[in-house]
Design a protein with these regions (language model features):
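Short acidic (Asp/Glu) and glycine-rich catalytic loops that position anionic groups and cofactors
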Residues: 9-12, 42-45, 105-108
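Alpha-helix initiation and N-capping motif
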Residues: 15, 24-28, 37, 41, ...
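Basic, low-complexity intrinsically disordered segments
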Residues: 48-56, 70-128, 132-134
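Basic, short loop/linker segments at the boundary and entry of helix-turn-helix/winged-helix-like folds
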Residues: 29-67
Length: 144
């Protein structure tokens, strides 16, 4: 007997936990467990205004998105953002639920230029990440 996929399944509503949808051995889960991301806030606090301007993008998210791009060999920030829109593991890693809007790809260039130009913040942040990851079973950090 032939079975047909019902189009109705596309419109079903399910109550899901994103944490359960990301495998326990997923690379991003392992990295997230290995790193205490709060160190980034201390490094960048003098680059943000606390009183004026529009709400900023979370600096941890600003670092995690290019990390996803690098780890998964995505060629451009524009494509990275498109991938994040549909990838549950990426959203989980970034702390976004399925309805949260993914930042526009141009947000990154603007933030990097305005906040991090002429600094070594990225080097400090990624050195810290590599050090933290080196203590996990991802010891081949030389390849990162």
């Amino acid at each position: 007997m032939m079975t047909e996929n019902a189009d109705k399944k596309r419109e079903q509503i399910h109550l899901l936990c994103m944490d359960e949808m990301v495998p326990k051995d997923h690379l991003l889960r392992i990295i997230d467990k290995a790193i205490d991301w709060t160190f980034i806030y201390d490094l960048v606090k003098d680059k943000y205004s606390h009183d004026t301007g529009r709400p900023s993008m979370d600096p941890v998210t600003l670092i995690k998105i290019p990390l996803i791009q690098y780890l998964y060999g995505i060629k451009s920030m524009r494509q990275t953002v498109k991938e994040i829109e549909v990838n549950v593991a990426y959203r989980w890693f970034l702390g976004l639920d399925m309805t949260d809007k993914v930042p526009h790809f141009s947000t990154f260039g603007k933030n990097y230029t305005r906040r991090f130009k002429d600094t070594d913040l990225f080097e400090q942040i990624f050195a810290h990440i590599l050090e933290a990851v080196s203590y996990t079973h991802l010891r081949a950090h030389e390849t990162l």
